Swiss-Prot record:
Pfam families: UPF0182. PANTHER family: UPF0182 PROTEIN SLL1060. GO terms for cellular component: extracellular region; plasma membrane. Disulfide bonds: none annotated. The chain crosses the membrane at residues 15-35, 60-80, 112-132, 174-194, 210-230, 257-277, 282-302. It is a multi-pass membrane protein. The keyword S-adenosyl-L-methionine does not apply. It comes from the Bacteria. The keyword Transmembrane applies. This is UPF0182 protein Ppro_3567. Keywords: Cell membrane, Membrane, Transmembrane, Transmembrane helix. Belongs to the UPF0182 family. Its main location: membrane.
Length: 900
């Protein structure tokens, strides 16, 4: 039995290194295969230089950090392993039961320590490789031309140098501690450190070696204190961000003293360890710790409580100003022009007629109901899916129109027959778009279309010549095109229409090596064995547009809402906004994720058919993008090179204005005293439990001659519901990117969205109608409440949708309009406006609020009331509850007139 166990043990000992070697080789092969497939992808998209630059940076950073650790640790282990100590042959403490004596352990010391240091070097190298962007930033850094107001460093130091210095500091400390720990372990094994009954006995050679490491570590700690002084500029001081009075007059001074004192204390500690004078050794770090606690923790609290708190406004004013200036720069708020908006309620029917383009482009269709409606009317087959609806503007039949557009993508989860050939060779792409106006409604309450169906039927001068969507938001799987199997294009009544890919996207499958590579990458032997794949075939992967652009440019932050446009040639192109950002701008207030600097510097375009990607520079003044341009000179193109037909569809990002609005609500106050007292703090209105979001519309801005596409968001004063201002970002050239804040008089009440919402909820007629619809089994869905500035007045518009149930088809059945004290609900926007402003006679409809008295006599009014009552009773018997409710509303108005 014992012999058998011995043989098993010998076999394990023999094959264990082989298993490790095989595992390492397999991991290496897998890594190289992925690396090669990534290179093929970058080569296909024309960005191979980005791949090589990134690869060199990651490799260089990994070798630098890992190599430094391995070299430093090996030098220290070499010194430790050369040392000779007595007492060889004695059992190690705690290892006697294992049968390990010191001689055996000493022989294992070198290989084990080598292995451990190699593993630690791999860890450090991996951490270093993750800092490749910081390394490239440092190597290509630029000056901004603006210095921080406290230390006087150029802002470029914080953006491009400090991140790498922080990483070097952290890795340096880890390297020194790793060397000290491994050297200590070797000394213990070799007998340089003994555990005796009287305590720990440390040989003189060991003490000298560790003393040197302690001195080096003290220098690393001092460097850390030096870098920590810069981080004071990111401090959260409650009322503002950045270094304040206490930071400047206590913590900054302490960090500077500690930076100078810590190396001296480290030298004292090293000398104490070298000589074995432990009191001297412990005194030095005790002084540093005491000074740190006193200057960083204790004294700042005392200073804050007894000096700053009673005089905070006076003492913190210059630092508040620093915070205001930096935050306005960080979020590009300086470009926002503030304009007074002297609102009135004098809007007339003539004004409505003069702003016809604005009225016709008020968005009545909400994204969620429209997406559900599109899905039920235009999905065509279960394997097609509408993922999102986007806003844009086009010249449609000669009119500048806001439209809603949704791509019809392929949903692999809903394929009727799931097998490899169907999923990878036949069903390869989505097909076409659904495209319609934002405000037009059919008699049934359904959206109208400019482009619909498969193949695309265009009811306007918008033509889609290349409707296939190979690259989209739902294209998460690889496909192989140009095979012997025809691709499915679209269904017809007589059968399916097929197609063959004619684009240049994807990687050619022109060799056995590539087939083997992708078979391994996607873990299927079918790619290697399929006879349908020829040398002309191409494999399309990274087809999800979000994944695609993030793979190419992971250093950019991309918007979560790509939108599809139709260019002049009828091709479908995705436009995705890209941002540069940083967490390192001094004194700037951060977002929740830590970002305190952001610019929309890049517009990304992806062709939905061939997957080609272009990055266009939309903000050439952004210093971070300038550094990216130095790192990747072939990545970005000037905005002037973007085709003119695509530039017409560039829009100001919803996400960016949302961020800027959140900051501008506070940082429009540029006077430190007003800022400190929050005298004019704004908020983004909240309806229900959700804050309003910016929305696109076409309108004529005050003082402008023509309508334009804008992004708009209102503000209310803090903890109040009336309007304070509205923010607008312009989207059309040549005014693109200009932002205005139109402010209302503070001494007048201007109804805000929440107040209008409350009035709608309290309106007896609207409540009655909602109740009637509910009793009939319909679900009423109130759409977004929009504020529409026209001339010097404000209109509020809210659509009302009806659905048979939660899964039913939403129909736009009513439009609610509020103006001043008037509130109406009608079947469409035109009728609602006619009820308020007059003009063409509208059908009898609901209206509430102040209206002009008629000259009718009481007898005439009484006859009219009786007539309306009889009509209402007839409608009630017929079960026409909607018309019945309208007649009751009209009766209510007549009775009110009679009462007056």
């Amino acid at each position: 039995m014992g012999t058998l166990l011995l043989e098993v043990t010998m076999l394990k000992n023999k094959f264990f290194p082989l298993l490790i070697l095989v595992s390492v080789l397999l991991s290496l092969i897998s890594y190289l295969l992925n690396l090669y497939s990534d290179w093929l992808f970058f080569d296909e998209t024309g960005f191979s230089s980005v791949f090589t630059t990134t690869l060199y940076a990651k490799t260089g950073a990994g070798l630098l950090f890992g190599g430094l650790l391995f070299l430093f640790v090996q030098i220290n282990l070499h010194v430790a392993n050369r040392a000779q100590f007595p007492l060889s042959g004695m059992h190690l403490l705690g290892a006697g039961n294992l049968g390990i004596n010191r001689d055996q352990a000493v022989r294992l010391c070198k290989p084990v320590s080598m292995l451990v240091s190699f593993v630690l070097a791999l860890l450090a190298g991996n951490l270093g490789a993750m800092k490749w962007k910081d390394l490239l930033f440092f190597a290509n850094r630029l000056t901004v031309g603006t210095v921080d107001p406290l230390i006087g460093k150029d802002v470029g130091f914080y953006l491009f140098s400090l991140p790498l210095l922080d990483a070097v500091k952290g890795v340096s400390g880890f390297i020194i501690l790793a060397a000290a720990a491994l050297a200590t372990a070797v000394y213990y094994v070799r007998g340089g450190i003994l555990l005796t009954e009287r305590g720990v006995a440390i040989d003189e050679k060991v003490r000298r070696h560790l003393a040197v490491l302690v001195g080096i570590f003290a220098c690393a700690v001092a460097a850390g204190f030096y870098l920590d002084s810069f981080k004071l500029l990111y401090a959260d001081n409650g009322a503002f961000y950045g270094a304040g009075y206490v930071d400047v007059n206590s913590r900054l001074l302490t960090y500077r003293v500690l930076t100078f004192l810590t190396p001296l204390a480290g030298a004292m500690l090293a000398i104490g360890i070298w000589k074995g004078v432990w009191r001297m050794a412990l005194l030095a770090p005790a002084i540093v710790v005491a000074l740190y606690m006193l200057g960083i923790r204790v004294y700042p609290g005392v200073l804050q409580k007894f000096k700053v708190a009673p005089n905070e406004m006076a003492l913190e004013t210059p630092y508040i100003m620093n915070n205001i200036t930096a935050t306005r720069f960080g979020y590009d708020l300086e470009k926002i022009e503030t304009v007074p908006f002297d609102v009135d309620t004098k809007l007339t029917a003539a004004d409505i007629a003069n702003n016809d383009a604005t009225i016709k482009n008020i968005r009545l269709w909400d994204h969620a109901p429209l997406l559900k409606t599109y899905s039920q009317l235009q999905q065509i087959r279960t394997y097609y899916k509408f993922f999102d609806v986007d806003n844009d503007r086009y010249m449609v039949n000669g009119r500048y129109s806001q439209v809603m557009l949704s791509p019809r993508e392929l949903s692999y989860a809903d394929l009727p027959s799931k097998n490899w050939i169907n999923e990878r060779l036949i069903f390869t792409h989505g097909n076409g778009i659904t495209f319609g106006p934002v405000s037009r409604i059919s008699k049934e309450g359904l959206p109208e279309f400019f482009v619909k169906d498969i193949p695309a039927v265009s009811l306007a001068d918008i033509k889609v010549s290349r409707p296939e969507i190979y690259y989209g938001e739902l294209s998460n799987e690889y496909v192989i095109v140009k095979t012997n199997v025809p691709e499915f294009s679209y269904p017809t009544a007589t059968g399916n229409i097929t197609t063959t890919y004619a684009g240049t996207g994807g990687v050619p499958m022109d060799s056995l090596l590539k087939k083997a590579l992708f078979a391994a990458k996607f873990r299927t032997e079918k790619i290697l064995l399929s006879s349908d794949i020829t040398k002309e075939s191409r494999i399309l992967y990274n087809r999800n547009i979000n994944e695609r652009i993030r793979t190419i440019a992971p250093f950019l932050h991309f918007d979560s809402d790509p939108y599809l446009v139709v260019d002049q040639k009828g091709r479908l192109k995705w436009i995705i906004d890209a941002y540069t950002h940083s967490t390192r701008l001094p004194y700037s207030r951060p977002l929740k994720g830590g970002i305190n600097y952001i610019r929309n510097s890049v517009k990304t375009v992806v062709d939905a058919y061939d997957g080609s990607v272009d990055f266009y520079i939309s903000d050439p003044d952004d210093v971070i993008l300038k550094v990216h341009g130095r790192i990747f000179p072939k990545l970005f193109k000037p905005m002037a090179e973007m085709p003119g037909d695509l530039r017409k569809h560039v829009r100001y990002p919803h996400h960016l204005l949302q961020i800027q609005a959140a900051m501008f609500a506070t940082y429009h106050m540029t006077d430190p005293k007003v800022f400190y007292n929050k005298e004019n703090l704004w908020e983004i209105p909240v309806l229900g439990d959700k804050a309003m979001e910016p929305y696109y519309t076409i309108m004529k801005l005050p003082g402008e001659k023509a309508e334009e596409y804008i992004l708009l968001l209102p503000f209310t004063p803090s903890k109040r519901d009336n309007l304070a201002a509205w923010l607008t970002a312009r989207c059309d050239e040549p005014q693109y990117g200009k932002i205005r804040a139109y402010t209302f008089p503070r001494d007048r009440l201007i109804y805000g969205p929440k107040q209008i919402d409350a009035r709608i909820n309290q309106d007896s007629f609207i409540s009655q109608q909602l109740t009637l619809w509910s009793q009939r089994g319909s679900e009423a869905i109130r759409g977004s409440l929009l504020v529409i500035p026209i001339e010097k007045s404000l209109l509020y518009v809210q659509p009302l949708f009806l659905a048979a149930d939660k899964a039913g088809l939403p129909e736009l059945k009513r439009v609610i309009v509020a103006f001043g004290d008037q509130l109406v609900m009608e079947e469409n926007l035109e009728l609602a406006l006619q009820r308020i402003f007059g003009g063409k006679k509208a059908a009898p409809a609901a209206t509430s609020g102040v209206s002009a008295d008629t000259q009718a006599s009481p007898a005439t009014l009484a006859k009219e009331a009786v007539s309306i009552y009889e009509k209402a009773i007839t409608l009630q018997r017929q079960g026409n509850w909607a018309a019945y409710g309208e007649e009751l509303r009209s009766l209510e108005q007549i009775l009110k007139k009679m009462a007056r």
